[in-house]
Amino acid sequence: MENDRIERQYQDSKDLVAYLMEKSEVSFATYIDSVYKKVLVLSAASYFESVISKDISAYATKVSGSDKRIVTLIENKAIKRQYHTLFDWDKNNTNKFCSLFGENTKNKVREQLDENEHLKAAERAFVELGRQRNLLVHENFAEYDVNTTVEEIYEKNKLACEFVSYIEKVLDPSFVKQLAQDG
């Protein structure tokens, strides 16, 4: 589920910084590195927003059948320009988002995450990138310093992609059927 563009941005940043260092342009290399960190954070968070928004819309479409009014309502009032309100970015989990689909869904997701340390780490990476995105956008983009390396951002992105794929499964009607069987 990883995004090829983000992969290219990461490779471009590494290549450009290496080239500048080879030419002894340390100041330019440092500047480019700081810019690409912001680009990668925004690119990853934007990609996740796009995928999860589409997943929510697809879920609404599947469960609403031929009546598309609920889909339109969800797209207009829950998704468009509202994505970042679906999560509590100051927490290290996605409980707020999952609880929007009911307490049973939240509890089942939490149970599955607690049983799988890798998936739990993927959730934390997703939340961290969303938090960094908000800080960049709301805390003076030009001045804000992303206090992590390009490599760390890229690795968090890859890990967070796994969590976004998991959310797609949660937003499948079969997940609700599983809840009913487990309950």
Give, region by region, the residue ranges found by the protein language model.
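Short, glycine/acidic-rich hinge or "gate" loops at secondary-structure transitions
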Residues: 60-68, 177-181
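Amphipathic, Lys/Arg-enriched alpha-helical patches that create a basic surface
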Residues: 120-135, 147-183
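Flexible secondary-structure boundary motifs
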Residues: 63-143
